[in-house]
Amino acid sequence: MAKKNSVFSRRLERHLDELKWLYQELYHDEHSFSYFLEMLERSWGERKRPLRDQDARREADPDWYRRRDLLGMMLYVDAFAGNLKGVKGRLPYLQECGVNYLHLMPLLQSPKGRSDGGYAVSDFRTVQPELGSMEDLEDLADACRKAGISLCLDFVMNHTSEDHAWAQKARAGEPGYRERYFFYDSWDIPREFEKTVPQVFPTTAPGSFTQLDNGQIVMTNFYPYQWDLNYANPMVFNDMTEHLLFLANRGLDVIRLDAIPYIWKELGTNCRNLPQVHTLARMLRMVCEIVCPSVLLLGEVVMEPAKVAPYFGTPEKPECHMLYNVTTMATTWHTLATGDASLLKRQMEAVCALPKDFLFLNYLRCHDDIGWGLDYPWLQERFHIFEVAHKKYLNDWFTSRWPGSPARGELYNDAPRLGDARLCGTTASLCGVEAADFEGDPFKLERAVSCDVTLHAWMLSQSGIPVIYSGDEVGRFNDYTYHDDPDRREDSRYLHRGAFQWGLAELRREPGTYQEKLFQGLRRLETLRAGEPCFDAGADVRVEDSGDSRVLALCRRSGDRELVCLFNFSSQFVHAGVDRAGGYTELMYGTKYDSIRSIELWPNGFAWLLRDEGAQEA
């Protein structure tokens, strides 16, 4: 062990009792735990001086990632700049965008044609060759650190590619490797699993198991080439934790734990959100606090709010530092399609009731599809809206099948028998910018751009870290060329994963273009957010009655400052507001109001209203 009183020993001592208790609760294996501790110390010893210095700074400032000026962007390395060196060369553009949190989509080695967009990893310590090398990743991380940009990377925990060395050895029958996965010699147990385990991809990859050429059966909850890891085996947890720390030591600031609710399997359950998952998440949090305390864990939990919040853990025993605000994202698009903010109001009331320590990543679009995980029992009780029919309406609206819809999207995993499908498309295309530009209609284009900016204003109004999907800052449209790619044509998510069009992005500098209007609109919003204390993570936030179901009203307070945010989700002019007297100033355009009980909002428009200094609250 490290010498007495060393930094490592001090951190380990703080967590050792709980860490050992949880580890032995799962594994009852002293030898594996001893190896685990040795691995942690070895990983700490391999951490270079600049990272250890950053660890010390962030330990002294544990809320560093809760600043209101944090702005994220997620992107694919190849689509954005070709390779990692190209991304490094484009850091000035990211700084122009105001980005100081950069999430690189999966870039570790994965087989061509069987990669699931990089989520089928065949080597956790090798970068996909066409994207660069591990040295290039470390060089980019160093450059980001100097530029004040935190770097995030995905860590695929639930499964490996069938081409991973462990999987190849398991297939060949090498001792100790079948036990790293879920192998069976007959369908008896797999059929029992499938009685209770929901299918992830019922259309494109039905079932949860795959039979190999040699007759063996292996668990594959996602795609047949992604073999689920068995975390009941302590060597799997030990080795995957070591891989995570290897990546952390390359200079990453945030590690996204992909599909974390799925990582523990138990016969007779749905194999989702089991108690052991939280034990593993808690141990990973302690591992980071011991070895690399400047590194944050971002949990990918794409589920309803009641199942998301537990992944924060508790103040005494935290798990993930941050989680995605998935339900609010999906509810936002529902609200745009219906023109009614009632469900979004209910959703935000639930979010506002959570402890302020809980930090969400807020977003409109990402690399993935939009799944319609809404509060259907409430919709049915309140509006007699039924799940299957409503999902069809939403998908029809956003794929332009509904009369009058300006949206241009495509369906993903369409399952007519189940009455279910998910949605793909960029923000600009779903807001109608693509259709209006194609039609050459300046009036429609102005409305669509306004809608796009309003949705971003809504995202920026929420507590947490706002994250933009690369290209949205300049109104990137859908990329339909994936239809011509045999490796991608079956996956409509590539509709919004196309190459960044640098030529069109240059139009952000030309006044009057929609690219310039979107880019400058978003930069103005981001600058206002960074400078206004009401957007602090610790601000008091509540939803208020706007007097109109089409308009959502959000009130943020910090000290004696108050900001009222109004959002019109309908395509009509609306008069709405909150019960306030006294002077208010609209931050985006500078309009002054003596009262905001009823102000005019443009179709799909918004207002950020700051109470004037000295004005009295009604």
Positions of PLM-derived features:
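Active-site and adjacent substrate-binding regions of carbohydrate-active enzymes
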Residues: M1-G583, L587-A618
